[in-house]
């Protein structure tokens, strides 16, 4: 999309700091809900605005651009820092860990024993305010074996085919984390 390279060249950390984060969140959330659920679909102008807002929020939250070297988004969903308790089940093995961040497409789990990419998992995500944890299937997509400048050791998990109820619950967690992060 033509807006991303232009946006990347114009917006820097000084401009991001001038924008009121709560105003960004207020404008982003309804567009993000419609983009995720597709009802009604976003117009091209709304999609471009969603991409601008996502860039500003990601830059504000992570301090780095979510755009790769060729001007393409690195991820389809906004990652938001949050610490949630997660119970991982893989066969008869159970582990409890926490998140570093979450998005509507997946999460990053902090662990010194990351699993191999491609490993399927059953996740139970609990933020302490839910009546019951959100249960969803996921797959390990990448690992960071040691703590480094990019963050703690752990693994990136993609949510696999969440149903509407799971998507809505995950969306609520992301929205709550976004509101708390800014």
Tell what function each PLM region has.
Residues 1-102, 175-182:
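N-terminal helix initiation/capping motif
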Residues 20, 34, 38, 147-182:
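C-terminal output/interaction extensions
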Residues 125-127, 140:
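Hydrophobic beta-strand positions in extracellular immunoglobulin-like domains
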Residues 97, 135-144:
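Short beta-strand-centered aromatic/proline hotspots
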Residues 91, 104, 143-149:
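Short, conserved beta-turn/loop elements at beta-strand boundaries and strand-helix junctions
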Residues 79-125, 154-158:
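Short strand-loop-strand
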Residues 103, 140-144, 161-163:
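A generic structural motif
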Residues 129-133:
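Low-complexity, intrinsically disordered
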């Amino acid at each position: 999309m033509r807006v991303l390279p232009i946006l990347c060249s114009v917006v820097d950390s000084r401009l991001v700091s001038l924008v009121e984060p709560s105003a960004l969140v207020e404008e982003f959330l309804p567009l993000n809900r419609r983009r995720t659920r597709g009802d009604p679909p976003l117009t091209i102008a709304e999609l471009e605005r969603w991409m601008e807002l996502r860039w500003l929020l990601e830059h504000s939250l992570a301090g780095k651009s979510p755009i790769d070297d060729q001007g393409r988004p690195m991820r389809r969903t906004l990652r938001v820092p949050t610490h949630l308790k997660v119970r991982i089940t893989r066969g008869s093995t159970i582990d409890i860990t926490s998140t570093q961040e979450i998005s509507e497409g997946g999460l990053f789990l902090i662990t010194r024993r990351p699993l191999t990419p491609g490993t399927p998992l059953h996740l139970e995500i609990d933020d302490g305010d839910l009546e019951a944890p959100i249960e969803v299937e996921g797959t390990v997509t990448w690992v960071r074996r040691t703590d480094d400048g990019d963050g703690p050791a752990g693994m990136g998990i993609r949510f696999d085919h969440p149903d509407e109820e799971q998507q809505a619950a995950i969306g609520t967690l992301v929205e709550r984390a976004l509101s708390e992060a800014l």
